[in-house]
Amino acid sequence: MKIFKLPLAGLLFCTAPLLAGCGTSDKPEAPVSLTWEMGTGNAEPGYYENSFVLKNISGAPLPRNWTIYYSQLPRNVKQVGNPAVRVESVNGNFFKMYPTESFTPLAPGDSMRVTFLCSYKIDRNSHAPEGTYWVATADGKESSPLPVTLNTLALPSPESLPGYPDATKIYESNLRLENVSALKQWDILPSVKKATSAEGAVVLDGKVALAYPDAYAVEARLLKEKLSALYGLEVVDKAPVTIALETLTDKAKAVNDEYYDLVIDSDRIKISAATPHGVFNGTQTLLAMLKGKKAPYRLDAMSVEDYPDLLYRGQMIDIARNFTTVDNLKKLVDIFASYKMNVLHFHFSDDEAWRLEIPGLEELTAVGSRRGHTTNESRCLYPCYDGGYDPDAATVGNGYYSREDFIGLLRYAAERHIRVIPEIESPGHARAAIVSMKARYNKYKDTDVEKAAEYLLSEPEDTSRYASVQYYTDNVINVAMPSTYRFMEKVIQELAAMYREAGVPLATVHLGGDEVARGVWLGSPKCRALMKEKSMTKPHDLAEYFITQMADIMQRNGLKFSGWQEVALGHTEEAHRQLRTQAAGVYCWNTVPGYDEVVYQIANNGYPVILCNVGNFYMDMAYNGHPDERGLDWGGYVDESVSFSMLPFSIYRSLRTDGAGNPVDLDAAEKGKTVLTAEGRKNILGVQGQLFAETIRSFNGVEYLLFPKIMGLAERGWNAYPAWEELRGAQEQQAFNKALALYYEKISDMEMPYWARNGINFRLPHPGLLVKDGKLYANVAIRGAEIRYTTDGSEPDAQSALWEAPVPCHAPVVKAKTFCQGKESLAITLKTE
């Protein structure tokens, strides 16, 4: 892993206070400050008013020789007339503002308002502009960038924003979680298949013995480490209690390779399985049973028979948009393994960065892993997502995994029975790779033209005009160039070499394949020539050509390909016949209303499917519409109850409420939709969560968006056939409520205290509020929490009134927070008038 920490280059010049606010401080400062404000909605159809207030904080008039840059989630910007300061997009989510000929020098202390229109209304604070910096120009030379102080004004009337959590609906929803019985010893996450109590108990007090054959040495070592670190139990040769890891004598019991038995009696804990993976799963169950206990640890005699329903249970982590260090990713791997998840989808490349060292293609990290101020991207990419303007700074915008880092990650994950599936985003979402290979071309073009063009991914003569979903105009690889396939095979072979050195098998590489914009390739001479040569009639034929070529390259290298759902859509039957046999997994993500049938259509067509449903498993979707909840919302809101609600074999019944929190008619939701056939059912391999990083600014934010909502993913991957799935009407609702209540009890009683003890960040839910007959009622989904509230409009804190029972309330506004495990939730507001 590389974090760049070189000092910021010195200023090119600072000849006047107005250029860099030089003043009396040794540290140069920008001569301006900014205040951003969201204006009126629907200034014109599809556009919303925004404004910056630009203030001259220097001691001299502000001339016309400057540009201010900033980042913001992608959107169109436009202005009416001839503004004094122009605001425009540079590319994607990177913008700039600069004075026009209409600009008159701004006197010291004076301010001016810069108004512009944006597509997309901003209804959460994490979508506001950020990363503002100033660059001045003199005699054709730029100064070094300087940060600009940005004050973001609160969104107007946040409680009236669409999606703002309704305190009364939350209260009513929480009522279904009442009257839950006490947890049993085996009530863990994910739930075990079968548990049987017995007479007696075992007590673990300070020391424990551990017996195992050589085949389970790794599992024994990891168990020993966890017993010591988490519970203070020392493993010794002889102790009153022995934990035995054994091979299953009746291997016919093993439903699959991850099956295990766990038996506890008076002096022995026995974990039996047919494979090391099964043994590992059994050790995680034992460790989970200890979570809610105190030393000395008493475990009642019992037996467990357990196995997963789905053999693929994964989580995708995006380290491209914003960087997660290898140590933090290992922390996640350890946590995922504790919940018996078994795949890490390693999203290391995208438009905004390339994060893995590839020998022979050094530009991928020398250029593609760094973001900072640049006018030509010859040494770094443009800033974005608040990654900063300094390409050498230790920010979330900069960094990559060295070859050694990645090999270490592979070994670490493999010991914990987690496969790492790398993803090379292609042909779309490939801007970082495209820019990096342009830099390589420019480096060699004057000395070795053949070497310069060897891995080029773009055609200089291409005049295609397009905009991706993220508003990039240059992020798609040219699929007609032989150098494209040399590049892809080079990366694949280098990846395979890393896996070999790690001693870890590589079966597939994920090739991306999603969100290729309309209009790509149409202006490419090479693509037009290829279309003519191959008798192609439409642009999709080029996409089909790319994926079939890549499938052959993968097969030539002993691998199968994986990709997002687009890799299996719209092809000729001939292409389908080829791809079905060469696919390891098609990751179906777009299940928004109107598109949700695609998942089962792909499975019915013979492709192996991984369910990645945006409405249930996109962890980067905000928990709800509160303006201070980070995340996106294009696919809905996802919290721990929504992930728990997902039904792999009844996906149309997987979203129980709409965006406003109103109940959905589940019977109507599935009516007339594509039915999963018996063959299609066999093609559902598993489930996966996605965590894209556009709104993440720290590892703390990674954990916040994962926990607790990832618990629903872990549960549903292990137990894919919940009891309520086959029920209907009131019986179905009652069974679901009972299961959900138990799930929340496990999270609040077992998981949240564990996370708090072990430095894992997590989110607390809002309390629900109701004012009825002049009294304030409150509740919360988790047990053991405090609800504190105010009635004067102020923000609740740890000293605010504690709600314990209905209290008289005639205030026009009530604000409340949940407090638990040293944390507090975001405040929720209930207006009673």
Where are the regions a protein language model picked out?
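Short acidic, flexible loop segments centered on an aromatic residue
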Residues: 42, 60-91, 132
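Active-site neighborhood of glycoside hydrolase catalytic domains
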Residues: 468-583, 591-595, 599-601
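Intrinsically disordered, low-complexity Pro/Gly/Ser/Thr-rich segments with frequent PxxP/GP/PP motifs
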Residues: 82-122, 554
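Acidic, contiguous N-terminal accessory segments
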Residues: 23-27, 128-308, 562-569, 760-766
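Short, compositionally stereotyped local motifs that mark structural "simplifiers"
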Residues: 20, 211, 730-833
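Short beta-strand elements of extracellular/lumenal beta-sandwich folds
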Residues: 33-61
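Flexible, acidic glycine-rich loops studded with aromatic residues
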Residues: 560-568, 573-769
